Amino acid sequence: NNAAPRYCIETRGQTACSVTLPVSANGLNYELNTEKLTPLYRHHAIKFRTNLSGTSYFFDRQSAYDDAFGRAYLGWQRKDGKQTISVLPFYQAQLAGSSEFDSKKENNRRAAPYMLAHGVGVQLSHMVNPGNATQLYYSLERYRQNYRETDRALRNDGWHDSTYLSLARRFGSTTLFGGWQYNRFVPENKNIRNTVNNAAYHRNGFNIGWIQQWQVLGGLNSRLTASFANRRYKGIMAFGTEPQRNRERSLSINLSHNKLSYKGITPTLNYSYSHIRSNAPYAMRNIHQWSLGGEWNF
């Protein structure tokens, strides 16, 4: 349920302690990506892409914490032997269980529309030197989000901007990569009740990773990724006297084996760890997650 560890805050001479504690559950995580290119002229094409993902805790009767995300793109792409560039307008919808709605009673049966958004993304991929398999990738994205609930919309409706730059190089059966990402959120309402809207933020982060094909182990594939980021909010945080500052760290490990594939489906073993340190006690997080999955390319 993405709740912070138990904490207490001193406010107006009184002590207030959290009542919502972390809850564990077994769930089903799913993801489906589709893409189709329709050639136009020479290197130009119309590109259609969809992404669908989410988590369901239905079988543990914890669907109040379900989430789902869908995005559909339709735009233009140009691709040649060294470079790919695309401009893709998109529309997205986010669904959530009742735990994300302040105005709803607890419901463990279904997720409901929570947030809608529309925007445009630009992606550029460039093969620096095909001979040594070095690739440079750059993306730029901007979208506007609209929340369903009035009170949440007051704080969180607005524009998201992000840019990402990465460099990857392959050394035989080894691939190393690293990247930098910048995000910001600019709320539509800069001030609320004569106070700076503290939902606005800037985030700087970078990641490093290692992909390995272990031929000596008969086809084992591994992927290790670590990321580090600092998020700085504007305005004064709730129950505080200064802006909120977060330090975010994460680590993920993914394993698969070619010989375990069955009819195109490859099982995967995944582990992820995320940790957030913050001067706001309610923003602290420490999450471990194990999952068994199956990847199917068709």
Regions found by a protein language model. Give the residues of each.
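Residues on the lipid-exposed face of transmembrane beta-strands in outer-membrane beta-barrel proteins
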Residues: 30-39, 72-78, 120-126, 163-169, ...
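Outer-membrane beta-barrel channels and translocator barrels
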Residues: 37-44, 79-83, 125-131, 170-174, ...
